[in-house]
Amino acid sequence: MKNIYVVLSSTPTMMGKIIRVFTRSFYNHSSISLTENLNEMYSFARYRASNPLVGGFVKEFPERFTLGKQEDVCIKVFSIPVTEEQYETIKLFIYKMKQDREENIYNSLAALGVLLGYKFDTYKAYTCSDFVVRTLIEGNVLWDACLSKNIIPDEIHMLLEKYATYSGFLNAYKPITGVNYDAEDFFEKSGAVNEVAYTLYHFYRLIKRNIVYSFYIASKLSQINKIFTV
């Protein structure tokens, strides 16, 4: 048997605080790790500290949670026992995401949908919680119905409560000692003009995918109707 680790966090960022207020939740971010020391922890989040709206598949590290500030973060860790086959399936799913990181982007529309009570399904676009739950579904830990609506970290908490192994501050989580990471890209500043351009392009990609996906679904429904009306 092996273990997969899910980490929920209550980050001190402005975006994190807004999400917690609107969702009335304690946690605002979800991550998944292949190792207990969180050396292989992944999620969908911002690419750079300076822009919370543009993101995608990322490998996470402690300083991402606080944007480099000297603050601690409340986390909850769930240690989920899985078979060797489940572990490899989950690992392969994550690594495929990593290889296709240019196409897999953060679903900022879905994040807004959580706040507005509307679900945006977008091709190859995920929120942090979408990604964690989809990964667990791939490994047959959770079931498809878990994604029938917008899912938030506190709902993941309810689904995985029996696997909880740690609740407290990130800095006090002992297994994290000695983890190596490169934070240079995350804290790189590209300037206000570039950030605006990145944001506009990011939302253009999301909206375009939503329009294309809507036409695709409409086409499929039309084909099904023709079959049943013949």
Tell what function each PLM region has.
Residues 1-230:
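Cysteine-nucleophile amide-bond enzymes
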